[in-house]
């Protein structure tokens, strides 16, 4: 099953997440099909907190991809801001 979820990157105590489309059987930070955005929970000042390619997210959801809870909240916030 294809899912859209967060893959953790960054340094210790400084998380940075990539929003990726992947097979649900792959490891959290493992192989992915496509990167559709990022989420920086520690963004401050002029730094960008979230960037999502909503067209690609809609494409994958249309093909039957499931969305994790956290990514669903990010999509909702991005739609509200746009």
Curated annotation (Swiss-Prot):
GO biological process, one term: translation
Organism of this sequence: Enterobacter sp. (strain 638)
Gene: rpsP
Gene Ontology CC, one term: small ribosomal subunit
PROSITE patterns the UniProt entry points to: RIBOSOMAL_S16
MF terms (GO), sorted A to Z: structural constituent of ribosome
Keywords: Ribonucleoprotein, Ribosomal protein
Pfam families: Ribosomal_S16
UniProt similarity note: Belongs to the bacterial ribosomal protein bS16 family.
Protein name: Small ribosomal subunit protein bS16
Classification via HAMAP family: Ribosomal_bS16
Tagged with keyword Ribonucleoprotein: yes
């Amino acid at each position: 099953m294809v899912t859209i979820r967060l893959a953790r990157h960054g340094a210790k105590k400084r998380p940075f997440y990539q929003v990726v489309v992947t097979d649900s059987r792959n490891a959290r930070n493992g192989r992915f099909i496509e990167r559709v955005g990022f989420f920086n929970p520690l963004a401050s000042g002029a730094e960008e907190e979230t960037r999502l390619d909503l067209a690609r997210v809609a494409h994958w959801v249309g093909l039957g991809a499931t969305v994790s809870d956290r990514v669903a909240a990010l999509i909702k916030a991005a739609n509200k801001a746009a």
